[in-house]
Amino acid sequence: MRKIYAALMTAMLVCVGCEWHFTSSDDDAEGTFVVERYDRIESLYLTTGDFSALQQMKTGYPQQTRALIEDVLKIGEVNDPEINSKFLDFYQDTILQALIMSVEQEFANIDDVNKELQASFQRLQQMMPGLELPQVYAQIGSLDQSIIVGNGMLGISLDKYLGTDYPLYLREDYGYTEKQRSMMTRQYIVPDCIGFYLLGLYPMPTDRKLSQVERDLHIGKVQWVVNQALGRRLFNTVFTRTVERYMKKHPTVSVEQLLKNNNYKDIR
């Protein structure tokens, strides 16, 4: 199993927050499930210091901005009188300015992401009737979390999906392994969105200490469901195969029942 992926998915769920609210060229169809481009307003402010962009971030995207400042960057509280200058100064680092430009270029168009995201969540809703869709937006972080989940909202840090060979990812001081970098591509945006969202809804139990096998099985359940939502087998591990065998033997078990079942002995 991709233990690094499992570890990342588990760790990243500690950061919560977020929402969606911006009219852009990628949001041209009413009722279409798309990624909201909060990152564009963020980029405008961080590269030009445009005060109107900052105001739009705060008034149009208050929860995203709070999550970015307090939970992702951890540079202070959003109500701090000095937070505007702290926020702008933080991104004046030449590396982060280059990161912003790379995100703007790589993700100028995300129609492919929107298309796969909508199709995948539609499949997920078919498997899990009544599942509420998250509000999804994109942001630019600082190479920390990939996906931010909380309160029915889901934020994508585009700076973590610039490609396996993106120069910053290759630097030793960032410490990314080859396996980690293999998943830092735009092809993993939608799988990560679904996986993190499901882990937020169906977290590992905290009322007892889990063995490593139990933890791997929990991630295996989520990854198996992600495969079904994607319509392809992206994750093919001993644990996803274990879950697949279990579901074939128990055709009356729903996906929701599978995810809620934390008695891992039933699945092994």
Predicted regions and their residues:
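Sec-dependent signal peptide recognition
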Residues: 2-9
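N-terminal mature-domain "stem" immediately C-terminal to a signal peptide or N-terminal signal-anchor/transmembrane
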Residues: 19-89
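C-terminal motif of bacterial Sec signal peptides marking the signal peptidase cleavage site
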Residues: 14-17
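Acidic/His-rich structured neighborhood in mature extracellular/periplasmic domains
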Residues: 87-268
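Exposed boundary/loop context
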Residues: 10-11, 134
